[in-house]
Amino acid sequence: MTVPLIHSRDVLESRLKEIPAEPGVYLMRDATDQILYVGKSKKLRSRVRSYFRFTSDLSPRIQRMVAQVCEIEFIVTDNESEALALEDNLIKTHQPPYNVLLKDDKKYPYLCITWSEPYPQLYITRHRRLDRNQDKYYGPYTDVGLLRHTLGLVKRIFPLRQRPKPLYKDRTCLNYDIGRCPGVCQGLISPEEYRKTLTQVAMIFQGQTDELIRELQEKMIQAAEQENYEAAARYRDQIRGLEQLGESQKVSLPNSTVSRDALALAMNDSRACIQLFQVRAGKLVGRLGFVAENRGDDPGLILQRALQEHYQYCDPVEIPSEILTQYELPDHDFLESWLSQKKGRKVSLVAPQRQSKAELIELVERNAQLELTRTQRLADRDAAALERLAEVLDLPDVPRRLEAYDISHIQGSDAVASQVVFIDGLPAKQHYRRYKIRNPEVRPGHSDDFASHAEVARRRFSKMTPEDQPDLVLIDGGKGQLSAVMAVLADLGLDHLPVIALAKREEEIFLPGNPVPLRLPAQDPARLLLQRLRDEAHRFALAFHRQQRKARQHASTLDEIPGLGKYRQKLLMEEFRSIARIQVASEDQLAQVPGIGPKIARQIYRYFHPETQAESPETAQVE
């Protein structure tokens, strides 16, 4: 079927009648069979019908989606809990473009522990990677300075891996000598022992510092009774450090033992801002912000969606025993049961009436209102910038979808390109694309940005569909790059697309057929928007270039190992993911990789640990 259902009422009614009034999941597809949206409902028929009954009441974004729907699929489940789990899996698998209910507020940092690695790292990040299920994220934290201070204290209290990569191949660095690192780079501590230390560190960021102190106090007493005074002193120093850490944490709430989350929102006609405050052991340790589109839904339903999306991705230990909400949630009993099952113990959902709990909700609501004001100001700024852009470029309509392209290389080596997309002035990362330049003329020692831009333009726009047609294309460069792209578009019959180039030096805007560049004032909203778009394309291209260069350098390192061909190199990289991890792996760990075996493992280990060859009886000279 290629005709949207909204244009064929008979077909639509027939299709809706086929959908049962049972719990389950529905999938909406477009003319190309792409999944546009995945949803779940207690009554599938009623929920799906609501999209087509009063379309004028839908938000502009959902109206655009409904106008593309050509087919509706459904999967019936036994209950709503199964539907929720299935919806989650389908969204993760297909990543439908209209399933962006909530957007993480990226200004809040997390602490990540990479449990997926043999020797986990601790680092601060603003992006949660959901594709690595073993890694754990703690936070978010409102004060990145305090988080860095906390992490610095933790690394002084516990001997931890201090670097992402070893400083030396054949010896430890100063951190080992002063007791800051247990010698991870040289395998002086086993992964099992190191993970025991990381488990203690994780307790700090789970709000279990008091419990950890009690555990260390018991170990200190045991060590002293066994006359192991060195270990006892180490535990004593760790306890003192943890007590110092507790003093530097955020303001305590009246009950110093309580752990709970609190959700509240503020909304206007277009959007809702949700805030989630995290209280652990009586301390306000984190805050998470979401922005949701206001589709005219009840505030309680918006809060419920935010709660579901947040806790779907949480580790059970991150779910507190009590969650406060500003409003009573429509599916209160179901959600309470779902959260309790996920955590493995009772979780209470409460819309508080008591003074102390109500005051916490009021605090969260005030913060949500402040965030709504800030978000609306940014949205107004972007809307004004887009209107100004249409004015200065003489566009027929205010542009919604902006695309930018940049090339990144070092003298022609590892040449790549980026495509970034802004929709309504904001990054739409699900539409970002990366390209490896295939042109044989672009090679180390010989760069050609014109040819690279032409290649990317042909690869992108020869496959363009009406749904992903840009309203404006920005090329990073000058007249030459613009001419190269326009020649390709003319060849494809697409030279009607609005295309401009932005030169870095003077921030001049070049338009096709106009030899005189357009110069806008430094604070012009249109210029600032184009600069943000161009800079994002540059960042994305540079990150991909560095990734490709690093992979090539890693491959060249492995090429030097005798008997290690491309296939085995691939096996190693799939298992360890980096040269640094291969370097610190033991001979037994290397041999356990399928396709490697003891003999090749020995050669790999000796390459990274040349001192072992002198100690090996196989290499000793016979006298």
UniProtKB/Swiss-Prot annotation:
Subcellular location(s): the record lists: Cytoplasm
List each copy of the UVR domain by range.
Answer: 210-245
A cellular component annotation (GO) from this entry: excinuclease repair complex
Extract the InterPro entries matched here.
DisA/LigA_HHH (IPR041663), GIY-YIG_endonuc (IPR000305), GIY-YIG_endonuc_sf (IPR035901), GIY-YIG_UvrC_Cho (IPR047296), Hlx-hairpin-Hlx_DNA-bd_motif (IPR003583), RuvA_2-like (IPR010994), UVR_dom (IPR001943), UVR_dom_sf (IPR036876)
GO MF, one example? DNA binding
On whether Secreted is a keyword of this UniProt record, the answer is: no
One GO BP on record is: SOS response
The record's similarity note reads: Belongs to the UvrC family.
**Record's subunit section:** Interacts with UvrB in an incision complex.
This chain's protein is named UvrABC system protein C
Tell me what gene encodes this.
uvrC
